[in-house]
Amino acid sequence: MAESNFVDYVKIYCRSGKGGRGSTHMRREKYTPNGGPDGGDGGRGGHVILRGNRNYWTLLHLRYDRHAMAGHGESGSKNRSFGKDGADKIIEVPCGTVVYNAETGEYVCDVTEHGQEVILLKGGRGGLGNWHFKTATRQAPRFAQPGEPMQEMTVILELKLLADVGLVGFPNAGKSTLLSAISAAKPKIADYPFTTLEPNLGIVSYRDGQSFVMADIPGIIEGASEGKGLGLRFLRHIERNSLLLFMIPADSDDIRKDYEVLLNELKTFNPEMLDKQRVLAITKSDMLDQELMDEIEPTLPEGIPHVFISSVSGLGISVLKDILWTELNKESNKIEAIVHRPKDVSRLQQELKDMGEDEELDYEYEDDGDEDDLDYEYEEEDWEDK
């Protein structure tokens, strides 16, 4: 089976650059016998920076580039010349990427907008040259600061797609059929469970050139929170949605029970998802006449808008779009910033294994003869912001 191009979970090793050494150069010129210190400052080490890029919608490009390392700052030189700063390492990521510490599971940052930049690891500051340490009683200091050391961290990048409406339902509930019917998206559709193996996004056109984004994820089954089926690992992609559209087919034995099962799986995954506005669509309703619809209506869950639809015949599609648009534009349904919970450390290694990301990514450092940098006592007042 070919490997999917949709990658929403990768582990990478990141390392910033260390600061360059300050110079200990003493000015020596023919007619300046007591020139004194003129050693320049070392350059700043490169930062590791995450940048949101709307042209990416998957983390596939990072699966084969697991080491992100910035450049080291260069040493200062004579005439108080600054060392060159190390090159920053820019990591382009899709909007909606969340970063966790791969060792502790702690939430680190979130990139949600195109062009947004987040400094993941700061480069070390360059060491001060010896001219900074000249005093009335110390005219010729023959020492300078080493640069600050680099920082390193192995991180998990987890993509959570950005959409307005998320489709929730069992396999074969008609989610992909609806998405293909009301948008230009072309998800795989077939009459067997788990046809959808990865999330799909579609832009739904509304009136007067307005539109909203809909996300379809693999179907959920009862027990998904215990590892059954495919859907649970993809639920992160509807965490950011303003509205959840529950889809249950008209031939269900008990629509209310199926709705409660789906609701419980969401609650198990993230209780905050129950705070989102919900709409219920009874799919495949072209098999029903008005009398059957009237019989089913009293048995439906209370307190949420509902509509009978058929993606094949077009029944109720316009009404559904009206309901979704109205709900999306209610002030009470405006999505708030997500509070990202840290990962459970006790389950983190198993999660990495399940996602195929349990490979060790440690990097072997090059020996550049700066061992004494590690022993230097860095004090904040010694540094100048550069």
Swiss-Prot record:
Top EC class, one word: hydrolase
Residue sites binding Mg(2+) per the record: 176, 196
KW Nucleotide-binding (keyword) present: yes
Main location class: cytoplasm
Compartment(s) where it occurs, according to its Swiss-Prot or TrEMBL record: Cytoplasm
Every OBG-type G domain range: 163-329
A GO-annotated cellular component: cytoplasm
Single annotated GO MF: magnesium ion binding
GO biological process: ribosome biogenesis
Pfam families, alphabetized: GTP1_OBG, MMR_HSR1
EC identifiers of the protein: 3.6.5.-
This protein's name: GTPase Obg
Species this chain originates from: Bacteroides fragilis (strain YCH46)
Gene symbol of the encoding locus: obg
